[in-house]
């Protein structure tokens, strides 16, 4: 995790939004660790809207509409699912403090979810933070094949439709790179972020 890290003795929702506006985001070492630290990567993960790529097979799956897609329907369930340990994710950085903070951001209209439902069962989803014309993706989970990927496709469609200019993924992963995510140097990211913060806060 290249970049600067600094511990924070206490974070309020307003401080959290201010941090996002200047390029910082919080993490914990583990779900059981009460400490939170700020992260500012040297290379920032960004998913450019004009280079967003969906494979033919995934596009075909999306068209079949295997799940009901909902927005902002079950925030606490989504972040709880993202915090769960799984075989592919034995540890998580989402602790109780982070869950509480983002739940408050949801109540304030700054945190949002995209959810995949199969009947009455939540089977995939993602959450993130909106500020200005930027959306900061935080975490995702999947309990069915392609569920989180389909949520990402719907997220990008939604952000494009609403006029967002920046989709920040924090870091890039091989998974996100298949969608077109790139690493952006800190200085270039700062310019992109400044432009997004000059925008009025967009409706998600």
From Swiss-Prot:
GO terms for molecular function: leucyl-tRNA--protein transferase activity. InterPro entries: Acyl_CoA_acyltransferase, Leu/Phe-tRNA_Trfase, Leu/Phe-tRNA_Trfase_C. It catalyses: N-terminal L-lysyl-[protein] + L-leucyl-tRNA(Leu) = N-terminal L-leucyl-L-lysyl-[protein] + tRNA(Leu) + H(+); N-terminal L-arginyl-[protein] + L-leucyl-tRNA(Leu) = N-terminal L-leucyl-L-arginyl-[protein] + tRNA(Leu) + H(+); L-phenylalanyl-tRNA(Phe) + an N-terminal L-alpha-aminoacyl-[protein] = an N-terminal L-phenylalanyl-L-alpha-aminoacyl-[protein] + tRNA(Phe). It is found in: Cytoplasm. Keywords: Acyltransferase, Cytoplasm, Transferase. Pfam families: Leu_Phe_trans. Its EC number is 2.3.2.6. GO terms for biological process: protein catabolic process. GO terms for cellular component: cytoplasm. Belongs to the L/F-transferase family. NCBIfam families: aat. Functions in the N-end rule pathway of protein degradation where it conjugates Leu, Phe and, less efficiently, Met from aminoacyl-tRNAs to the N-termini of proteins containing an N-terminal arginine or lysine. This is Leucyl/phenylalanyl-tRNA--protein transferase.
């Amino acid at each position: 995790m290249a970049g600067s890290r600094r511990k924070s003795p206490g974070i309020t929702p307003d401080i959290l939004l201010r941090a996002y506006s200047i390029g910082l985001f919080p993490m914990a070492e583990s779900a059981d660790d009460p400490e939170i630290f700020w992260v500012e990567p040297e290379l920032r993960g960004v998913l450019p809207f004009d280079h967003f790529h969906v494979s033919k097979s995934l596009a075909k799956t999306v068209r079949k509409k295997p799940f009901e897609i909902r927005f902002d329907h079950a925030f606490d369930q989504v972040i709880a699912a993202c915090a769960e340990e799984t075989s592919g994710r034995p540890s998580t950085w989402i602790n109780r403090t982070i869950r509480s903070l983002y739940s408050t951001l949801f109540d304030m209209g700054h945190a949002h979810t995209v959810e995949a439902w199969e009947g009455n069962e939540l089977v995939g989803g993602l959450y993130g933070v909106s500020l200005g014309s930027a959306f900061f993706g935080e975490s995702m989970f999947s309990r069915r094949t392609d569920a989180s990927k389909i949520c990402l496709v719907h997220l990008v469609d939604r952000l494009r439709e609403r006029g967002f200019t920046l989709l920040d993924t924090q870091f890039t992963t091989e998974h996100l790179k298949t969608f077109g995510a790139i690493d952006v140097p800190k200085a270039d990211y700062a310019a992109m972020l400044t432009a997004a913060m000059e925008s009025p806060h967009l409706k998600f």
